[in-house]
Each structure stands twice: as structure tokens, then as C-alpha cells.
Amino acid sequence: MTGSAQNRSPELQRVYQMWQGVLSDRGSDLTTMRDTVEEFYRKNFHLAEDVEVEAVFDPVPGLWITTSAGRGRSLLYFHGGGYALGSSKAHAEMASWIARAARARVFVLDYRRAPEYRFPAAVEDALLAYRWILNSGADPRTVVVGGDSAGGGLTLALLTSLRDRAEPLPGCAVCISPWVDLEMTGASIIGKADLDPLLTRAGLQQFADWYLGGQNPRQPLVSPLHADLRGLPPLLIQVGTSEILLDDALRLAERASAAGVPVTLCQYEDMPHVWHVFASFLPQGRQAANEIGDFVMQHTARAAAANQQPR
């Protein structure tokens, strides 16, 4: 056991133990992996009484998550899972913590997953969902986009796609433990391998193969680390220091800052991949959710207040 592991709180030790069990049978077929992930979330996480859930099927599938904290802004959220696992239902509880902190309605999109639907299907779905939210009357200045892991990469793919099409950009964006380099060239892929309880290079490679089906992993919409990031809205990046995707986040922050993007980078000591999932009992999970809420309100408050003024 490392010194870092020896100093973990009981709550954090519980997180590591729980994450280790999710994909413990890495030789399973995709259907079994999906079922295991959904069962993990169903068994361990539950919505608070003040959370309202509204299912949407057309024009895009997903769940609206709303809490009693308010609904003055909209957050379009892309779940993680290597573009192959995860769902809006699995991420509903995590989304509710963010919704409460940001005083926002959160729409968790069920984008088409690989390998049944390869790149660029997820990006196309993200564009459709964003346009739908704006066409429903939302002021883009009060809209936020965000996601975790693969969803963090999808967030950046959406932003660069909107910019290149000269479409309205959201007020800000949030990337949690983002996966933005599908070639896995970051030093932490190897350097943090003994610390990360969930992800492995081999596992990420399998997800990349499913998503790409032989396509070039360096395409900017696949690996936004290689994208032109100029002109994007303020960006919050959160990452744990014990995850193999640490360098994805650090390099993204460096390149976005160099491109003139206002970047807030927050590293959480000893946190594993997407620790926010455990906000119900992990203090750092609640802290990270509250940090997202503060960031969102900082960058959308003026527009949200203006929209509430009588006309």
C-alpha cells in the first residue's frame, strides 16, 4: 500500500473499493459490461426526494433532472463510459448534485453509443440536443455544456463544432476527468496506472477501437487535444491526481489557455476518475459539485437575471 493509500479517509477508501469492482471482469462481453455498470449505479445511488425526472424521447432521448434549488439555467450533460457504456439513468443522481449546486435544469443526453454507432454519431447527437435546447427558447448565455470522461471530450467536440458553424456558443463549459486523447499518449497513462482503480490503457484502447472502427484517432472531433480551441467559452476542468487521464486534463488546460480560452483547472488530490459520482458520502465529491455550481453561476448569472426581468 502506498503512503497515499495509507492516508485515505474511510470514505475515499470506500470509493476506491467500489470503483475497482465495476469493471473487475474486463474480459466480459459488451452487453455484460453495460449491464454491470447499470446495476452498479442502480444499486448504489438514489435520487433525493426533491429531484424531478422527466424523460424525453423526441427529438433527442434523455432525462431532464431538476431540483428544488431552481431552474434559471440549462445544462446539457454528456455522460462518460468510453462512448460505449453509461446512460442518462445511471448518471441521474450525479447530475442532480450538479443541478442543485448550479440552480439549473440538467439534461443528460442518451447519445448513440459505440460500437453500434461509431464516430461521428455521438457528436451529431450532441449538436442536435444543443440546438433543441436553444430552439425551445433558452438563451445560449444561460446554457452550459459539460460532461465526464468521454463526455468531457464530447463537450469539446460540440464546442468546436458550434464555433466552426458560427452557431451561438453556451455561456461556459465543464469537463470532468476529460478523455481528450484517444491515442493515450499522456505520461499519466503509465505513470498513474498503479493508482487508478477503474481505468486501464487496454480498456481505453478497447473503447477507442469500438468508437472509431479504424478511423484516425487524431481527428480534432475525436481527440479535442488536437483541436483549434480558439474562441471557446470559459472552461472549468476538474481532474483527480490518481487517474490515468490526469495528463489529458493538464494538457487540455495548457492548450486551451494558450488559445486564449479562460480556463479554471482544479486538481483534487488522491481523487480517482469522476469521483463526483460518490457525492452522497464523499466530501470531495460534494466540493467538486459545488465548485461546478459556483462556476456556472459566475458565468451565467447576469444573463439569467436579465431574462427574469419583466418586459
Each model region followed by its residue ranges:
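Short beta-strand element of the alpha/beta-hydrolase
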Residues: G72-G81
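Serine-hydrolase catalytic core
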Residues: Q215-M271
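Short strand-loop-helix active-site module centered on a catalytic nucleophile
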Residues: G62, L76, I98, F119-L182, ...
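A glycine/proline-hinged amphipathic helix-loop "lid/cap" segment
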Residues: M1-G70, A301-R311
